[in-house]
Amino acid sequence: MNHFLDIHKTDTAELRQMMDSAHAMKAARKGRPKGQLDEDQPLAGRMVALIFEKPSTRTRVSFDVGVRQMGGQTMVLSGKEMQLGHGETIADTARVLSRYVDLIMIRTFEEATLLEMAEHATVPVINGLTNRTHPCQIMADVMTYEEHRGPIAGRKVVWAGDGNNVCASFLHAAGQFGFDFTFTGPSTLDPEAEFVGYAREKGRRVSIERDPAKAVAGADLVVTDTWVSMHDPQSARERRHNQLRPYQVNETLMAQAKPDALFMHCLPAHRDDEATSAVMDGPHSVIFDEAENRLHAQKAIMRWCLGL
C-alpha cells in the first residue's frame, strides 16, 4: 500500500514509473470514446472515495472519469457531508472509510487533515490538494512538458506571481525531476523557504528574481496561477491585483523566453489578469493538454497506490 501525499515523499524511481505509466495509458486510449473502459480495467471491483472539503471541478471530474475508465466506482463526499474533524475525529473517519473503500482521495484545506487521514487509514490516501501543496497537478504538468518537449531534466522553469501551493509542488518536482526553477513575484508572496531549500538540497538551481523580464529570459517553461482565491474578500482581491500586475504573463514577457518555450496554467484562470488571452490561446500555450493530463497522471498515481 502506497500513499501519495507529496512529490518529495515519493521515491524518484517510483515517480518515473508513474510518469511512464501515465504516458502509456494515454497512448492506449487514443481514439477511444471517453466512457469506454480501459482494456485491462485495473480498478474492476474497487471503490474509491473522493472527499472534497474544498470544492473543485477539474479534480472531481478527472478523478471520477479516471476511476470509471479503469473499471472502478466512486463515492463523492463533500465537506458538508463529511464534517471533517467536527464531531467524529479525522482518525475515526479514516478508519471507518477504510472499511468501505479501497482508496481515498482527499482535497482539503489543512495539510494536517491529509496527514492524519493517511496516518489512520488502512487503504492508500492521495493528496488531491491542500493549502500547502498540489502534487497531482504537477505530475500532470511534468507529463505535459515531456509530451511536447521531452525530458524536463536540466530545463529552466519560471513561476510568475504568487508562490502558492502549486508553486511549492513545482519546487518539490524540481528536486525530483532535476530541473532548475526561478520564482518571480513580490517578496511578500515568495514560496516558503522549506520548499526552496528542498530543491537546493537536491542540487537544483533555484533563484528569486524580482524583475519578471530577467526571470523569464531563456526559460523553457513559464507557469502562473490565479492571483486570488474564491474565498478572498474584495479588499484582498484589489490588493493582490496591485501587487501582482507587474507579473502578468503577456506576449511581451513570453518573448523573453526561448522561442520554443511552453506556457502552463493549472486553470481555472482569470483571463487578462495573471495571463492574457493572447498567451493562453497562443502558440506557446499547452493549458488544455495540461488539463487533460490530470486524468492520465492521476490514473497512474492510483495504480501505483494500489500496486497495480
Curated annotation (Swiss-Prot):
EC number of this enzyme: 2.1.3.3
Residues that hold L-ornithine according to the record: N165, D225, S229, M230
Q: Where does carbamoyl phosphate bind?
A: S56, T57, R58, T59, Q83, R107, H134, P135, C136, Q137, C266, L267, R294
Pathway in which this enzyme or protein is active: Amino-acid biosynthesis; L-arginine biosynthesis; L-arginine from L-ornithine and carbamoyl phosphate: step 1/3
Enumerate the UniProt keywords alphabetically. Amino-acid biosynthesis, Arginine biosynthesis, Cytoplasm, Transferase
Give the first-level EC class, as a single word: transferase
Q: Which GO terms describe its biological process?
A: arginine biosynthetic process via ornithine; citrulline biosynthetic process; L-arginine biosynthetic process
Kindly list the GO CC terms recorded for this protein.
cytoplasm
Q: What reaction is this protein's catalytic activity?
A: carbamoyl phosphate + L-ornithine = L-citrulline + phosphate + H(+)
Q: Name one Pfam family in it.
A: OTCace_N
UniProt GO MF annotations: amino acid binding; ornithine carbamoyltransferase activity
User: What InterPro entries does the record point to?
Assistant: Asp/Orn_carbamoyltranf_P-bd, Asp/Orn_carbamoylTrfase, Asp/Orn_carbamoylTrfase_sf, Asp_carbamoyltransf_Asp/Orn-bd, Orn/put_carbamltrans, OTCase_ArgI
**Localization of this protein:** Cytoplasm
Family of this protein: Belongs to the aspartate/ornithine carbamoyltransferase superfamily. OTCase family.
Known HAMAP family for this protein?
Answer: OTCase
Q: Which PANTHER family match?
A: ORNITHINE CARBAMOYLTRANSFERASE, MITOCHONDRIAL, ORNITHINE TRANSCARBAMYLASE, MITOCHONDRIAL
Described by its record, this protein's role is as follows: Reversibly catalyzes the transfer of the carbamoyl group from carbamoyl phosphate (CP) to the N(epsilon) atom of ornithine (ORN) to produce L-citrulline.
Protein name in UniProt: Ornithine carbamoyltransferase
Originating organism: Cereibacter sphaeroides (strain ATCC 17023 / DSM 158 / JCM 6121 / CCUG 31486 / LMG 2827 / NBRC 12203 / NCIMB 8253 / ATH 2.4.1.) (Rhodobacter sphaeroides)
Give the lineage. Bacteria, Pseudomonadati, Pseudomonadota, Alphaproteobacteria, Rhodobacterales
